[in-house]
UniProtKB/Swiss-Prot annotation:
Name by which UniProt lists this protein: Beta-galactoside alpha-2,6-sialyltransferase 2
The keyword Glycosyltransferase belongs to this UniProt entry's keyword annotation: yes
Pfam families: Glyco_transf_29
Domain of life: Eukaryota
Keywords: Disulfide bond, Glycoprotein, Glycosyltransferase, Golgi apparatus, Membrane, Signal-anchor, Transferase, Transmembrane, Transmembrane helix
UniProt source species: Bos taurus (Bovine)
Gene: ST6GAL2
Length: 495
């Protein structure tokens, strides 16, 4: 009996050992084949995705070289002397014969009335509580045993999301009214935008060191006189290193931008790309101005009723020149108009440092375009002009503003205030059609496009509204701000 019992015990032990080994192997197999993936940071994915549009959405475009530009030495193959062709009279005579050039620009049916083949528009992340987030941002599913407990919780979250949407909508309307009055604050922004602004303030990518004095209580006249005395349009003229050593003096247009348009320009229009301009029926009014400025890749074809068709000046950021999807070299959007490009540079405006490491390498395509189209006026704004505008915004704002360059919109407004007797700006300060649609020609939504995260947009708009001499009705219904040209401002001696 004992031998049988002993054999039985040994068999039991072997069986237990075999089952244990089997379970260990199974456990190791499943844990090795499906390792736990670390959960992505909620800020790194969601906030980055949400905040990219704050820089115009295009700041997310990759592929542009930021290294030392190649092929920018113009000592060989650069166009020498004055250009030939139909604009020779403009280049040679300068201010005397600009009307010949202007007649081509301001009275034309824009060849740029259609959009280039653009990349697919981005998709927006979740903007408000209750909005569906992007794919991949969904919370992990609950375990089966906990599903019954999550029902009431989900209902409460849904109700809370709807309450959040209503609250934000209410805040947005309140902020719009305060913006119309010119006394809004960053504290009224959505928490997401406040968080973004704080991040940019801490980062200070461009090394901003503001040493000016703040004078936020200036009257409209004092502010206009300060602008007149300090804001002088400046572009690269090829006389400063490193551009002087590269032959840029023979490359840039011989007539400065400030003297290009005749002083008979009575009124000019600055047409923003804001989605709020849709269904405005402002096209005919916009085309009635002597000159019209537009931005980046904003088309007119298909939108003529709302945005008009005339284009005189187009301001483009450096991404337009560097990203192939914009077809900068061959698109009709950028032909037969005055082009003005810009790129963020260090606050010190060190041209050597900027040339070696631009935000996007606009120098090479600029050289190529000038060599191919020597008769088309094409300028690059000087970094000192860009940061001078930033200084003025900060000087006239109580709060600290983002240490990033002003938006293309603000740059364009101040540019036209230097060139025109009166400037009408459309949908820069939003009308009652306010929307989170970033651009009228792209299905992309983000509040940062209107109120700013990267650019100090909120403070720019508050400053512009302080300068507004137009009517409240035009502001509310049309989103139109009327600004006096700086040359028309009458200032006391010494102002």
């Amino acid at each position: 009996m004992k031998p049988h019992l002993k054999q039985w015990r040994q068999g039991m032990l072997c069986g237990v050992f075999a089952w244990g080994l089997f379970f260990v192997v199974i456990f190791l197999y499943f844990t090795d084949s499906s390792p736990a993936k670390p959960a992505p940071s909620s800020f790194s994915f969601l906030e980055t995705r949400r905040l990219l549009p704050a820089q115009g959405r295009q700041r997310a475009i990759m592929g542009a070289s930021e290294g030392l530009p190649e092929g920018a030495d113009l000592r060989r193959g650069s166009p020498r002397g004055l250009p030939s062709g139909p604009l020779r009279t403009w280049a040679g005579d300068g201010f005397e014969r600009e009307q010949e050039f202007l007649s081509v620009q301001t009275g034309r049916t824009s060849l740029s009335s259609f959009a280039p083949e653009d990349s697919a528009p981005g998709t927006s992340g979740r903007l408000f509580p209750g909005d569906p987030g992007p794919e991949g941002a969904r919370p992990p599913r609950a375990a089966p045993g906990r599903r019954a407990k999550r029902g009431p919780r989900r209902q409460s979250l849904s109700a809370r999301g709807e309450d959040g949407e209503r609250l934000y909508s209410s805040m947005s309307r309140a902020l719009l009214r305060r913006l119309w009055k010119g006394d809004a604050s960053a504290r009224m922004l959505h928490p997401r935008l406040q968080k973004a602004m704080g991040a940019y303030l801490r980062a200070n990518k461009h090394g901003v060191r503001f040493r000016g004095r703040r004078a936020s209580g200036r009257s409209r006249t004092e502010l206009l006189c300060a602008l007149r005395g300090r804001v002088q349009v400046r572009t690269l003229d090829g006389t400063e290193p490193p551009f002087s050593a590269l032959g840029w003096r023979a490359l840039v247009p011989p007539v400065p931008l400030s003297r290009l348009l005749p002083r008979r320009l009575r009124t000019c229009a600055v047409v923003t790309s804001a989605g709020a301009i849709l269904n405005s029926s402002l096209g005919e009014e916009i085309d009635s101005h002597d000159a019209v400025l537009r931005f980046n890749s904003a088309p007119t074809r298909g939108y003529e009723k709302d945005v008009g068709n005339k284009t005189t000046v187009r301001i483009i950021n450096s991404q337009i020149l560097t990203n192939p999807s914009y077809h900068f070299m061959d698109s009709a959007l950028y032909k037969d108009v005055i082009l003005v490009a810009w790129d963020p540079a260090p606050y010190s405006a060190n041209l050597n440092l900027w040339y070696k490491k631009p935000d996007y390498n606009l120098f090479t395509p600029y050289v190529q375009h000038r060599q191919r189209n020597p008769n088309q006026p094409f300028y690059i704004l000087h970094p000192k002009f860009i940061w001078q505008l930033w200084d003025i915004i900060q000087e006239n704002t109580k709060e600290k503003i983002q240490p990033n360059p002003p938006s293309s919109g603000f740059i364009g407004i101040l540019l036209m205030m230097n060139l025109c007797g009166e400037v009408h700006v459309y949908e820069y300060v939003p009308s009652v059609r306010q929307t989170d649609l970033c651009h009228y020609h792209e299905p992309y939504h983000d509040a940062a496009c209107t109120l700013g995260a990267y650019h100090p947009l909120l403070y720019e708009k508050l400053l512009v509204q302080r300068l507004n001499v137009g009517t409240h009705g035009d502001l509310h219904r049309k989103g139109k701000v009327v600004l006096p040209g700086l040359q028309a401002v009458r200032c006391p001696p010494g102002a």
